[in-house]
């Protein structure tokens, strides 16, 4: 191993200042939770420059890099221990990688040799510089075609060289600054807000006109895979960036439209605690119940702004919605003290990030994390809610079709959901005042399931799945109430 380190929030802030890339996926934990990453991730270029810095600090004998190919194969999360390694070093070739728990996150293939002549680029060098942005551009995929321009470096090359001295010795200060500018281009300009930087291929040039700027032009878009290829030209380098435009966060049905599918007083006897009601299926469930005359309490663990938005929409329409903070990993009773009304129903949509990097076929830590949410957390909450519900409680537990039809790399998730189903059966048998509804939900368009490829969900919509469930829960509630008054 050449070197190792952990990236923390302070490192993100410093690199954002150097590069100008303040994409929320890196800087905003609340916004990042609504991306496929599920949490803030380290800038790929930051990890790359650290990798070059580690190499350059210990191998001053390496000659000129003539060409460079980089692949960002996995995301690096804050707190991950990243290891740097050289896998091959000869007179003509350098191969290196960064890894987390043995899983490769970045690979480098560099050819060593003489530099190429300065490249010509089809952008008028007298064209105006693209204005520096402090917020990432939200650009639709169709509007990225033929985008081009010039971008000034956010930081002078000398400061970048000070931050990454080993990388500057290997590449030169202007090239390090150009790489820093490339992450600003991807994260803030195009693709912008919903970007993923997947790789780059560069030819290093003997450019004597060392202007502190980067020229760029979008050269190809593959709409099916949302792939965007960007040609670049800067001081001492020329080539292209491989990027993707992520699917934007999924918006759930507005309550006014939800109301078109339910009777005004259909759920008028319901007081529903919707755990994880600040977005996704929880948000939709809260809107359906409120539109049907029910009272809802939505919870959030970290997304207070999202929960407040849902409550404001419901209240503005004329419904009833309260908001409380709730963390399923903590003791339940104290967190429920702020409830103004006693729930008759409980909907449980709490979940950690589902699609995460795995170091092996089976990851015990991931199973334990899933169980904390899907088993332990559910049991703690139900027991606490029952202590506050003298007339009993109906609870909905969302399992998954993945229990039976499991995709690759989802074994821990499927195991935990299966365990949750068994737990629900035992709870229903042991807790006489509890009614539990378990449904294996199909893949549905939510922030957690969004992907780069447009997936055909066979016409299944969140509304078509959740409305029948809410109606079944209403029947459970009536059955339970009638059994207690008989």
What would you call each of these model-derived segments?
Residues 1-7, 67-140, 204-272:
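HotDog/MaoC-like acyl-thioester-processing domains
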Residues 245-247, 435-486:
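C-terminal helical subdomain
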Residues 314-331:
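Rossmann-fold cofactor-recognition segment
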Residues 1-40, 117-173:
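Catalytic strand-loop segment that frames the active site of acyl-thioester-processing enzymes
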Residues 278-279, 302:
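Conserved glycine-rich cofactor-binding loop
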Residues 259-263, 351-429, 440-447, 453:
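Catalytic loop of short-chain dehydrogenase/reductase
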Residues 34-91, 174-215, 224-227:
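Hydrophobic beta-strand-centered segment that forms part of the acyl-chain substrate-binding groove
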